[in-house]
């Protein structure tokens, strides 16, 4: 955000529109439908200081205009496109269409509508709502510079063994025992930033970023679970998080930065006794699932050459 000196004070400003909801349907000649549902947020950086200092709104892009632009641009998209490409399209429009706008940030969350399978066949126009959400943020400057981030919200994963936690700091406040056998469950929030720094060197392949989103999600899940027949041991959420981020950077050379947040969602062993003896004796079988309170673990990993 640009900083100015106004009447002896440092002043920063921006304005935008949040929670603009839009759905778009595309129909192929063969009768197959495709649908997306997006929640769009827009932030503009512009020279409209006079609107704050005096009765002069002549330099403001109205937030209602921003909202209408979302629908107009969605209408113009005659071909299916990724949420990243739509975010870039919107941000590019604002910095090129308005002389006073120097930069734009567009955030979008995509609702996970997935094609339904009926009698073993993909339905032509039927969809069910999935779980994790696809997110993106495009930051575009009038110069054409770009910062593009994608992400996942709500990727819930769990494994019933091959997890432990041992040899941590102990003191008079510590009650947690060491273990090499526990359930590991988390809800992954992931962000990754692409290395593309200009509007003019983006991949031209249709739906490139949609495919990349699915591939990153697979790498994260595969690293968490390990091979299907034996899994992989996790000595801590921290170690598993690092391996997931590292696998992402190793697999995708055009990703420069990864941030993962992985709360430790606890499954507590159930032991219940009465004065007459055990009612439930825990044998790695009965648990109390709880997410309040929960551990909070997050970290970022980037390439050494990255500017991030």
Swiss-Prot record:
Q: What is its EC number?
A: 1.7.3.3
Alphabetized UniProt keyword annotations: Nodulation, Oxidoreductase, Peroxisome, Purine metabolism
Annotated residues that bind urate are located at 63-64, 165, 182, 237-238, 264
Domain of life of the native organism: Eukaryota
The active site annotation covers 17, 63, 266
Up-regulation conditions: In root nodules after infection by Rhizobium. Nodule uricase II levels increase from 11 to around 25 days after inoculation, then fall slightly.
Pathway the protein acts in: Purine metabolism; urate degradation; (S)-allantoin from urate: step 1/3
Which chemical reaction does it catalyze?
A: urate + O2 + H2O = 5-hydroxyisourate + H2O2
- NCBIfam families in UniProt: urate_oxi
Tell me, how does this one assemble? Answer: Homotetramer.
**Functional description taken from the UniProt entry:** Catalyzes the oxidation of uric acid to 5-hydroxyisourate, which is further processed to form (S)-allantoin.
Question: Which family, according to UniProt?
Answer: Belongs to the uricase family.
What is the protein name stated in its UniProt record? Uricase-2
Name of the encoding gene: URIII
């Amino acid at each position: 955000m640009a900083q100015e000196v106004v009447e002896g004070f440092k002043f920063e400003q921006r304005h935008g529109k949040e929670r603009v909801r839009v759905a778009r349907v595309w129909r192929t000649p063969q009768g197959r439908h495709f649908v997306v549902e997006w929640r769009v947020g827009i932030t503009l950086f512009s020279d409209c200081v006079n609107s704050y200092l005096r009765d002069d709104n002549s330099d403001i892009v109205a937030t209602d205009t921003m909202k209408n632009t979302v629908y107009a641009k969605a209408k113009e998209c005659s071909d299916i496109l990724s949420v990243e490409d739509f975010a870039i399209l919107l941000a590019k429009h604002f910095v090129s269409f308005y002389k006073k706008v120097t930069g734009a940030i567009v955030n979008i969350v995509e609702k996970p509508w997935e094609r339904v399978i009926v009698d073993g066949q993909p339905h032509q126009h039927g969809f069910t709502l999935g779980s994790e959400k696809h997110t993106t943020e495009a930051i575009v400057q009038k110069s054409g510079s770009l910062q593009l981030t994608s992400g996942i919200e709500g990727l819930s994963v769990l494994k019933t063994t091959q997890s432990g936690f041992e040899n941590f700091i102990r003191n008079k406040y510590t009650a947690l025992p060491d273990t090499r056998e526990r359930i590991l469950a988390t809800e992954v929030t992931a962000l990754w930033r692409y290395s593309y720094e200009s509007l003019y060197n983006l991949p031209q392949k249709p739906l490139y970023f949609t495919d990349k989103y699915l591939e990153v999600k697979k790498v994260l899940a595969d690293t968490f679970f390990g091979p299907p027949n034996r899994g992989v041991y996790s000595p801590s959420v921290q170690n598993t998080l690092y391996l997931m981020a590292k696998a992402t950077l190793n697999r995708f050379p055009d990703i420069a930065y990864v941030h993962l947040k992985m709360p430790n969602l606890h499954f507590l062993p159930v032991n219940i006794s009465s004065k007459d003896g055990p009612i439930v004796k825990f044998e790695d079988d009965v648990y109390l699932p709880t997410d309040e309170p929960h551990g909070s673990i997050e970290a970022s990993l980037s390439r050494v050459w990255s500017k991030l």
